[in-house]
Every structure is written in C-alpha cells, then in structure tokens.
C-alpha cells in the first residue's frame, strides 16, 4: 500500500440507478476485473460491493449499490436504504440510466420491465431533489441510438436540475467509460490509497464465493426461478495443500423451486457447481473443492442473520 500523500488521490464513487441499469457491468468494466455479479435478473446486487479501480496515481473505490426501486419486502427496503447510504458517503455519485428503457417508455413501446425502470429513474430524481444534491448522469446502453436522440434525452435530464455533468456510455463495450473515469479521477481528494495496489474488491472470500454461486443459479434458471433464492457459504476451509474446501447451501422458498435448482438427475445443480467452481478457481488462484446443497427455507428473506451477514439493516 502506498504511504505518500503528496501525489496520490483516493476516494469513493457510488454508482446508483434503477435495477438492471448496468451498474455491476460498469463497475466490473472500470475495475478491469469481476467484482459484482451480472445476470439477466434485475435486483441481483443486494448490498453495496466495493470495487477498486486504479488510474495513474488515483485510486477510486467504486460502490456498486443495489438498484433503487419502490420496495415492498423487508429485504427490498434494506437494499434501497443501502443504495442511498452508499451514495451519501461518497465523494462522487454517478446516476446510471438505461437510455434504451427510457426511450421505449417515452414511445409507449416499453416492456413492463422497461416501464418500471423509467418509473424508478423518476423516483431517484425526486430523491435527489429532496436531498438538494447534484450528481453525474451517465446514459448507458447507447449502442445504436442516434446522437441527436441522445442529446435530446440528455437535455431533458439535465433540465431537472440534479445533474452537474452528463456522459454517454456503453458499459458493455466500454464506449465513453474512459471519459467518465477521468471525471471521477478529478473529483477524488488527495491522500493515501485506501487499499493495496493488487486488491480489486472489498469483499470477504466467503461472501464472494456465495455471490459467484448465486450468479450461476440465476444464469441457469433465470426463467423458472423468481427472486426466491440465496446462497450461504457454510464452510470455507483453507487446506494444507493450498486448496480450499467450500460448502454452500442454496436456499429456496418452496419445494418446487428446489426441484428446479437440482434439475433432472441433478444435472442443473451439477452445472451450477462446475461453473461456480471454475470461476472461483480463477479468482482465488487455487484449487477449489465445492460442495453444494439445496434446502427449502420458506422465510429466509426475513431472517435477521442474513441481513447482518451482508451488511444490510434489518430494522427498516
């Protein structure tokens, strides 16, 4: 870790936005390594994940926050509160907007998901107005959209009075991300780096392992399984030969969901385990022995222990 303060900069930048706006993809892109899980499901990020990006002598700690939406369940309320809290504590905040969903909503051609996304964007704008805050706007998913159209949308957003700067980016291809990163660099205060140079994320290994497996669950059964599953790492043992033994339990709410996760002849669970094990071997840079179990626990999302494990407030 660097210990000089004369030339180095370091600080926090929060990425907020509606579910599925592309926040995790953007953080992974800026860090240059996998920090947050990315699936076709919205609301896959359940707690703020810190990714560490380095640009020259500047270290930016990127806080990938849960999507901000209209919450119903206790877990949803805790996720939204965590998102706003992550933004309030940062030196810079980027509001990431799915411009494809915004345009579809304006043209009355939106899918239900796109319509909800546009509504959630307005909820965020109202929250920023109430807090009297100005943040950076990043219009994401600009691929294939005419520049004149993008400029018109950007003006509409800028006129709300809550944005200091506007960037047009594609988190998936990297277009425009360099300019956004340069802006964040300029906003970081002088000071020593907050993390070692080779650290890309602030996430305990047990929790990282659970997140990787949860991603594989949703990638495999995203159409059949609603947001009724979580993964707990019940054992994480570093062995003398340098390998690690990990035991995890996939919790679902109903027996029918357990059957889906296991699959015919156990093939779905086998795929999840193999995909998760391969990625964990790559991330941890060691051999991984992964053992998965699937358990029905009807009210897992209402357990206080789950909230404390992932840093969320149970009493919301």
UniProtKB/Swiss-Prot annotation:
CDD domains: Era, KH-II_Era. Residues 9-190 form the Era-type G domain. The keyword Membrane applies. GO terms for biological process: ribosomal small subunit assembly. Its main location: cytoplasm. Residues 17-24 are annotated as: G1. NCBIfam families: era, PRK00089.1, small_GTP. An essential GTPase that binds both GDP and GTP, with rapid nucleotide exchange. Plays a role in 16S rRNA processing and 30S ribosomal subunit biogenesis and possibly also in cell cycle regulation and energy metabolism. This is GTPase Era. It comes from Caulobacter vibrioides (strain NA1000 / CB15N). The gene is era.
């Amino acid at each position: 870790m660097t210990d000089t303060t004369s030339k180095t900069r370091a600080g926090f930048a929060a990425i907020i936005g509606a579910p599925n706006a592309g926040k995790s993809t953007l953080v992974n892109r800026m860090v240059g390594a996998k920090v947050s899980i990315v699936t076709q499901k919205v609301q896959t990020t359940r707690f703020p994940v810190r990714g560490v990006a380095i640009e020259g002598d500047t270290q930016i700690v990127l806080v990938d926050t849960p999507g901000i939406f209209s919450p119903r369940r206790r877990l949803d309320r805790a996720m939204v509160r965590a998102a706003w809290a992550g933004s309030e504590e940062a030196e810079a905040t980027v509001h990431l907007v799915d411009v494809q969903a915004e345009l579809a909503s304006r043209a009355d051609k939106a899918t239900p998901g796109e319509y909800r996304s546009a509504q959630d964007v307005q909820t965020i704008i109202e929250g920023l107005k109430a807090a009297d805050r100005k943040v950076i706007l990043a219009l994401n998913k600009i691929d294939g959209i005419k520049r004149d159209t993008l400029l018109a949308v950007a003006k509409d957003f800028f006129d709300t009075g809550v944005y200091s700067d506007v960037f047009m980016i594609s988190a998936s291809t990297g277009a425009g991300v360099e300019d956004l990163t340069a802006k964040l660099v300029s906003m970081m205060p002088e000071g020593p780096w907050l993390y070692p140079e080779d650290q890309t994320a602030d996430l305990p290994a047990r929790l990282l392992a659970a997140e990787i497996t949860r991603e594989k669950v949703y990638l495999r059964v995203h159409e059949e399984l609603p947001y009724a599953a979580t993964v707990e790492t019940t054992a994480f043992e570093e062995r003398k030969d340098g390998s690690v033994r990990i035991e995890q339990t996939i919790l679902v709410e109903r027996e029918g969901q357990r059957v889906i996760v296991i699959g015919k002849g156990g093939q779905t669970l086998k795929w999840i385990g193999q995909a998760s094990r391969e990625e964990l071997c790559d991330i941890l840079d060691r051999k991984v022995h992964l053992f998965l179990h699937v358990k029905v626990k009807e009210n897992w999302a209402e357990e206080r222990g789950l909230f404390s494990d992932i840093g969320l407030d149970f009493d919301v």
